[in-house]
Protein backbone atom coordinates (compact mmCIF):
# COMPACT_ATOMS: atom_id res chain seq x y z
CA UNK A 1 0.00 0.00 0.00
CA UNK A 2 1.43 3.37 -1.04
CA UNK A 3 -0.59 5.61 1.29
CA UNK A 4 -2.49 5.36 4.59
CA UNK A 5 -5.37 7.80 4.10
CA UNK A 6 -8.50 6.07 5.37
CA UNK A 7 -9.20 2.87 7.24
CA UNK A 8 -11.60 2.21 4.37
CA UNK A 9 -8.53 1.51 2.23
CA UNK A 10 -7.82 -1.60 4.35
CA UNK A 11 -9.35 -5.04 4.34
CA UNK A 12 -9.28 -7.29 7.37
CA UNK A 13 -6.26 -9.23 6.14
CA UNK A 14 -4.23 -6.02 5.79
CA UNK A 15 -5.18 -4.91 9.30
CA UNK A 16 -4.30 -8.30 10.76
CA UNK A 17 -0.91 -8.25 9.03
CA UNK A 18 -0.10 -4.82 10.47
CA UNK A 19 -1.18 -5.87 13.95
CA UNK A 20 0.99 -8.98 13.69
CA UNK A 21 3.96 -6.87 12.58
CA UNK A 22 3.40 -4.45 15.46
CA UNK A 23 3.42 -7.38 17.86
CA UNK A 24 6.75 -8.60 16.46
CA UNK A 25 8.17 -5.10 16.84
CA UNK A 26 6.85 -4.96 20.41
CA UNK A 27 8.93 -8.08 21.06
CA UNK A 28 12.02 -6.32 19.63
CA UNK A 29 11.98 -8.29 16.39
CA UNK A 30 13.01 -5.52 14.02
CA UNK A 31 16.12 -4.00 12.44
CA UNK A 32 17.02 -0.76 14.28
CA UNK A 33 18.86 0.45 11.18
CA UNK A 34 16.17 -0.40 8.64
CA UNK A 35 15.41 3.29 7.96
CA UNK A 36 19.01 4.51 8.03
CA UNK A 37 19.31 7.29 5.45
CA UNK A 38 15.51 7.71 5.20
CA UNK A 39 13.71 10.95 6.09
CA UNK A 40 10.13 11.38 7.31
CA UNK A 41 8.31 14.73 7.12
CA UNK A 42 5.70 15.47 9.78
CA UNK A 43 3.41 18.31 8.71
CA UNK A 44 1.09 19.10 11.61
CA UNK A 45 -1.34 21.97 11.07
CA UNK A 46 -3.32 21.07 14.20
CA UNK A 47 -1.98 20.50 17.74
CA UNK A 48 -0.67 17.04 18.57
CA UNK A 49 1.37 15.37 21.28
CA UNK A 50 0.92 11.60 21.00
CA UNK A 51 0.56 11.19 17.25
CA UNK A 52 3.44 13.50 16.33
CA UNK A 53 5.86 12.27 18.98
CA UNK A 54 5.07 8.60 18.45
CA UNK A 55 5.74 8.93 14.71
CA UNK A 56 9.01 10.68 15.54
CA UNK A 57 9.89 7.92 18.01
CA UNK A 58 8.90 5.23 15.52
CA UNK A 59 11.17 6.67 12.84
CA UNK A 60 14.04 7.10 15.30
CA UNK A 61 13.74 3.51 16.56
CA UNK A 62 14.05 2.33 12.95
CA UNK A 63 17.19 4.43 12.43
CA UNK A 64 15.63 7.19 10.33
CA UNK A 65 15.36 10.97 10.61
CA UNK A 66 12.30 13.20 11.02
CA UNK A 67 11.67 16.78 9.89
CA UNK A 68 8.76 18.38 11.73
CA UNK A 69 6.65 21.39 10.80
CA UNK A 70 4.26 21.96 13.68
CA UNK A 71 2.16 24.99 12.76
CA UNK A 72 0.52 26.79 9.87
CA UNK A 73 2.26 30.01 10.86
CA UNK A 74 5.72 28.44 10.51
CA UNK A 75 5.08 27.36 6.92
CA UNK A 76 4.87 29.21 3.62
CA UNK A 77 1.13 28.54 3.69
CA UNK A 78 1.01 31.60 5.96
CA UNK A 79 2.22 33.52 2.90
CA UNK A 80 -0.56 32.12 0.74
CA UNK A 81 1.00 28.91 -0.59
CA UNK A 82 -1.55 26.17 -1.19
CA UNK A 83 -1.46 22.84 0.61
CA UNK A 84 -0.97 21.10 -2.74
CA UNK A 85 2.14 23.14 -3.53
CA UNK A 86 3.51 22.60 -0.02
CA UNK A 87 3.11 18.84 -0.44
CA UNK A 88 4.70 18.88 -3.89
CA UNK A 89 7.75 20.71 -2.52
CA UNK A 90 8.16 18.70 0.69
CA UNK A 91 7.76 15.37 -1.09
CA UNK A 92 10.92 16.20 -3.02
CA UNK A 93 12.90 16.30 0.23
CA UNK A 94 11.74 13.16 2.04
CA UNK A 95 10.74 9.50 1.74
CA UNK A 96 7.25 9.81 3.27
CA UNK A 97 4.92 12.46 4.71
CA UNK A 98 2.72 12.31 7.81
CA UNK A 99 0.02 14.99 7.57
CA UNK A 100 -2.44 16.39 10.11
CA UNK A 101 -4.77 19.06 8.80
CA UNK A 102 -8.03 20.66 10.02
CA UNK A 103 -9.79 20.20 6.67
CA UNK A 104 -11.51 16.90 5.97
CA UNK A 105 -10.16 15.44 2.74
CA UNK A 106 -6.80 17.22 2.97
CA UNK A 107 -4.85 13.96 3.29
CA UNK A 108 -6.48 12.50 0.19
CA UNK A 109 -5.61 15.66 -1.74
CA UNK A 110 -2.03 15.44 -0.48
CA UNK A 111 -1.71 11.84 -1.63
CA UNK A 112 -2.82 12.83 -5.12
CA UNK A 113 -0.02 15.38 -5.59
CA UNK A 114 2.78 13.85 -3.50
CA UNK A 115 5.63 11.92 -5.08
CA UNK A 116 6.10 9.91 -1.85
CA UNK A 117 3.67 8.00 0.41
CA UNK A 118 1.32 10.03 2.64
CA UNK A 119 0.01 8.93 6.04
CA UNK A 120 -3.11 10.66 7.32
CA UNK A 121 -2.58 11.69 10.96
CA UNK A 122 -6.06 13.22 11.16
CA UNK A 123 -8.03 15.36 8.71
CA UNK A 124 -10.62 17.45 10.52
CA UNK A 125 -13.55 15.28 11.57
CA UNK A 126 -12.65 12.75 8.89
CA UNK A 127 -10.31 9.82 9.48
CA UNK A 128 -7.40 8.81 11.72
CA UNK A 129 -6.26 5.38 10.47
CA UNK A 130 -3.10 5.02 12.56
CA UNK A 131 -5.10 5.64 15.74
CA UNK A 132 -7.57 2.96 14.72
CA UNK A 133 -4.79 0.45 14.14
CA UNK A 134 -3.34 1.05 17.60
CA UNK A 135 -6.85 0.88 19.09
CA UNK A 136 -7.37 -2.54 17.51
CA UNK A 137 -3.91 -3.66 18.59
CA UNK A 138 -4.68 -2.66 22.18
CA UNK A 139 -7.98 -4.56 22.13
CA UNK A 140 -6.25 -7.61 20.64
CA UNK A 141 -3.77 -7.61 23.53
CA UNK A 142 -6.67 -8.23 25.92
CA UNK A 143 -9.13 -10.30 23.89
CA UNK A 144 -10.07 -11.38 20.36
CA UNK A 145 -11.77 -8.58 18.42
CA UNK A 146 -14.39 -10.94 17.00
CA UNK A 147 -17.41 -11.20 19.25
CA UNK A 148 -16.83 -8.12 21.40
CA UNK A 149 -19.44 -5.67 22.59
CA UNK A 150 -17.81 -2.24 22.37
CA UNK A 151 -19.30 0.97 23.69
CA UNK A 152 -18.41 4.32 22.13
CA UNK A 153 -19.02 7.21 24.52
CA UNK A 154 -18.60 10.92 23.86
CA UNK A 155 -18.39 13.17 20.84
CA UNK A 156 -19.21 10.72 18.07
CA UNK A 157 -20.17 13.41 15.57
CA UNK A 158 -16.84 15.21 15.32
CA UNK A 159 -14.54 12.52 16.72
CA UNK A 160 -12.52 11.19 13.78
CA UNK A 161 -11.12 8.35 15.90
CA UNK A 162 -14.60 6.84 16.29
CA UNK A 163 -15.39 7.30 12.59
CA UNK A 164 -12.32 5.26 11.64
CA UNK A 165 -12.78 2.71 14.42
CA UNK A 166 -16.41 1.90 13.64
CA UNK A 167 -15.60 1.13 10.03
CA UNK A 168 -12.69 -1.12 11.04
CA UNK A 169 -14.95 -2.92 13.52
CA UNK A 170 -17.36 -3.66 10.66
CA UNK A 171 -14.68 -6.03 9.35
CA UNK A 172 -14.97 -8.05 12.57
CA UNK A 173 -17.91 -9.69 14.32
CA UNK A 174 -18.36 -6.84 16.80
CA UNK A 175 -21.48 -5.21 18.23
CA UNK A 176 -21.21 -1.41 18.50
CA UNK A 177 -23.08 0.45 21.25
CA UNK A 178 -23.13 4.25 21.07
CA UNK A 179 -23.82 6.86 23.76
CA UNK A 180 -23.46 10.56 22.98
CA UNK A 181 -24.64 13.94 24.25
CA UNK A 182 -27.51 15.50 22.31
CA UNK A 183 -26.41 16.53 18.84
CA UNK A 184 -23.14 14.58 18.97
CA UNK A 185 -24.39 11.18 17.85
CA UNK A 186 -22.55 9.08 15.33
CA UNK A 187 -23.50 10.52 11.90
CA UNK A 188 -26.68 8.87 10.64
CA UNK A 189 -25.11 8.17 7.26
CA UNK A 190 -22.29 6.24 8.93
CA UNK A 191 -24.73 4.30 11.11
CA UNK A 192 -26.74 3.36 8.02
CA UNK A 193 -23.59 2.28 6.18
CA UNK A 194 -22.41 0.15 9.10
CA UNK A 195 -25.78 -1.58 9.28
CA UNK A 196 -25.73 -2.14 5.53
CA UNK A 197 -22.37 -3.86 6.04
CA UNK A 198 -24.02 -6.18 8.54
CA UNK A 199 -22.72 -4.57 11.74
CA UNK A 200 -25.12 -4.29 14.66
CA UNK A 201 -25.20 -0.70 15.94
CA UNK A 202 -27.29 -0.03 19.06
CA UNK A 203 -27.86 3.54 20.23
CA UNK A 204 -28.39 4.26 23.94
CA UNK A 205 -29.39 7.33 25.93
CA UNK A 206 -27.14 6.72 28.95
CA UNK A 207 -23.93 4.77 29.50
CA UNK A 208 -25.48 3.21 32.61
CA UNK A 209 -27.95 1.41 30.32
CA UNK A 210 -25.27 -0.70 28.65
CA UNK A 211 -21.98 -0.57 30.55
CA UNK A 212 -22.38 -3.99 32.19
CA UNK A 213 -22.70 -5.63 28.76
CA UNK A 214 -19.45 -4.20 27.41
CA UNK A 215 -16.09 -5.84 26.79
CA UNK A 216 -14.54 -2.54 25.70
CA UNK A 217 -15.52 1.03 26.61
CA UNK A 218 -14.03 3.59 24.22
CA UNK A 219 -14.33 7.09 25.67
CA UNK A 220 -13.68 10.31 23.75
CA UNK A 221 -13.55 13.95 24.77
CA UNK A 222 -15.85 16.65 23.44
CA UNK A 223 -14.07 18.06 20.38
CA UNK A 224 -14.09 21.70 21.42
CA UNK A 225 -12.10 22.80 18.36
CA UNK A 226 -14.84 21.49 16.02
CA UNK A 227 -17.65 23.50 17.60
CA UNK A 228 -18.91 26.61 15.79
CA UNK A 229 -18.99 28.65 19.01
CA UNK A 230 -18.01 28.44 22.69
CA UNK A 231 -21.60 28.46 23.94
CA UNK A 232 -22.43 25.31 21.97
CA UNK A 233 -19.42 23.57 23.48
CA UNK A 234 -20.28 24.45 27.08
CA UNK A 235 -23.84 23.22 26.57
CA UNK A 236 -22.53 19.65 26.34
CA UNK A 237 -19.20 19.82 28.20
CA UNK A 238 -18.98 17.66 31.33
CA UNK A 239 -22.15 15.78 30.39
CA UNK A 240 -20.58 12.37 31.12
CA UNK A 241 -17.80 11.04 33.35
CA UNK A 242 -16.35 7.58 33.94
CA UNK A 243 -15.79 6.91 37.64
CA UNK A 244 -14.78 3.87 39.72
CA UNK A 245 -18.35 3.74 40.98
CA UNK A 246 -19.70 3.51 37.42
CA UNK A 247 -17.30 0.67 36.60
CA UNK A 248 -18.36 -1.38 39.62
CA UNK A 249 -20.07 -4.58 38.49
CA UNK A 250 -18.78 -4.48 34.90
CA UNK A 251 -17.28 -7.55 33.23
CA UNK A 252 -14.07 -8.77 34.84
CA UNK A 253 -12.08 -8.39 31.61
CA UNK A 254 -13.65 -5.10 30.44
CA UNK A 255 -11.09 -2.49 29.35
CA UNK A 256 -11.44 1.28 29.15
CA UNK A 257 -9.76 2.99 26.19
CA UNK A 258 -9.40 6.66 25.27
CA UNK A 259 -7.46 8.16 22.33
CA UNK A 260 -6.41 11.05 24.60
CA UNK A 261 -6.12 13.85 25.49
CA UNK A 262 -8.81 13.62 28.11
CA UNK A 263 -10.36 16.63 29.80
CA UNK A 264 -12.63 15.53 32.64
CA UNK A 265 -14.50 12.60 31.08
CA UNK A 266 -12.46 9.99 33.01
CA UNK A 267 -11.97 10.40 36.74
CA UNK A 268 -8.21 10.18 37.55
CA UNK A 269 -9.07 7.54 40.16
CA UNK A 270 -9.80 5.17 37.26
CA UNK A 271 -6.13 5.33 36.20
CA UNK A 272 -5.09 2.82 38.86
CA UNK A 273 -7.86 0.34 38.06
CA UNK A 274 -7.13 -2.79 36.06
CA UNK A 275 -9.71 -1.68 33.49
CA UNK A 276 -7.69 1.38 32.51
CA UNK A 277 -5.68 0.73 29.33
CA UNK A 278 -5.53 4.19 27.78
CA UNK A 279 -1.91 4.93 28.65
CA UNK A 280 -0.88 1.51 27.38
CA UNK A 281 -2.98 2.30 24.30
CA UNK A 282 -0.99 5.50 23.78
CA UNK A 283 2.33 3.67 24.16
CA UNK A 284 1.19 1.18 21.51
CA UNK A 285 1.34 4.02 19.00
CA UNK A 286 5.08 3.49 18.61
CA UNK A 287 5.15 -0.18 17.48
CA UNK A 288 2.02 0.27 15.36
CA UNK A 289 3.45 3.32 13.60
CA UNK A 290 6.78 1.56 13.18
CA UNK A 291 4.88 -1.19 11.36
CA UNK A 292 3.19 1.41 9.15
CA UNK A 293 6.47 3.13 8.30
CA UNK A 294 8.10 -0.20 7.45
CA UNK A 295 5.29 -0.85 5.00
CA UNK A 296 5.26 2.53 3.23
CA UNK A 297 9.00 3.27 3.20
CA UNK A 298 10.98 0.03 3.47
UniProtKB/Swiss-Prot annotation:
**Keyword terms:** Pyrimidine biosynthesis, Transferase
Give the top-rank taxon of the lineage listed in the UniProt record for this protein. Archaea
* Residues engaged in binding L-aspartate: 79, 160, 221
Q: Where does carbamoyl phosphate bind?
A: 50-51, 100, 128, 131, 260-261
Transferase: is it a keyword of this entry?
Answer: yes
Q: Which GO terms describe its biological process?
A: 'de novo' pyrimidine nucleobase biosynthetic process; 'de novo' UMP biosynthetic process; amino acid metabolic process
Pathway note: Pyrimidine metabolism; UMP biosynthesis via de novo pathway; (S)-dihydroorotate from bicarbonate: step 2/3
Its recorded reaction(s) are: carbamoyl phosphate + L-aspartate = N-carbamoyl-L-aspartate + phosphate + H(+)
What is the annotated quaternary arrangement, including any partners? Answer: Heterooligomer of catalytic and regulatory chains.
| Family as reported in the entry's similarity comment | Belongs to the aspartate/ornithine carbamoyltransferase superfamily. ATCase family.
Q: What is this protein called?
A: Aspartate carbamoyltransferase catalytic subunit
Species in which this protein is naturally found = Methanosphaerula palustris (strain ATCC BAA-1556 / DSM 19958 / E1-9c)
Amino acid sequence: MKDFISIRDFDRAAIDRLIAEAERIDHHQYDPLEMKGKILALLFFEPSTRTRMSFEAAMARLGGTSLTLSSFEASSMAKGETLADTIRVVSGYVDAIVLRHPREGAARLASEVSSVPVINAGDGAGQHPSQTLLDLYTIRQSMPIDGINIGLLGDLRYGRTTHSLTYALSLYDAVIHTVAPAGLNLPSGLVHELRELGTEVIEHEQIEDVIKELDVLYVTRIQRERFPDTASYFNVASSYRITPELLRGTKEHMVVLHPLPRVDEIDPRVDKMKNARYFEQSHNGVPVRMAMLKQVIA
